[in-house]
Amino acid sequence: MRRAVCPGSFDPITNGHLDIIGRASKLYDVVHVAVMINQSKKGLFTVDERIELIREVTADFGNVEVESFHGLLVDFCKQREIPAIVKGLRAVSDFDYELQMAQMNNGLSGVETLFVPTNPTYSFLSSSLVKEVATWGGDVSHLLPPTVHEALVKRLGER
């Protein structure tokens, strides 16, 4: 069985993330979406909320499993016998950092990294940018799955 992981903070998941996960789901039998737990960063959504949102928007893929992880991604991969990491690249600036991470991960555990060029429609897109624009009242509905957009609007309204 071919397995891969798509890691990230997904705070919140965007259409760009969803595009990469969807493309990975066509290449692998099982795609694990690993939601990073970072104690030093207070997310807009809790890890459990992010997991639930990702499960909702990836349900139609049929071969995506979503869970959280804390620590080294290579340990997550080793525990689940996942030989590959799938990462989307938006720009050359992403490549510099992701290449270093890929080489470190391979050196630590032998896990391979597959770089997938981001769909040009989403080449500028990040969760941080979406949150910033939405905070100032900008329309980001075209950048997020509808259920995620609803959750974002609700959360920002609670602030």
Swiss-Prot record:
Biological or metabolic pathway of the protein: Cofactor biosynthesis; coenzyme A biosynthesis; CoA from (R)-pantothenate: step 4/5
Record-listed substrate binding positions: S9, K41, L73, K87
Protein name: Phosphopantetheine adenylyltransferase
PANTHER family per UniProt: PHOSPHOPANTETHEINE ADENYLYLTRANSFERASE
Family indicated by similarity: Belongs to the bacterial CoaD family.
Molecular function terms from GO: ATP binding; pantetheine-phosphate adenylyltransferase activity
Gene for this chain: coaD
Cellular component annotations (GO), alphabetically ordered: cytoplasm
EC number: 2.7.7.3
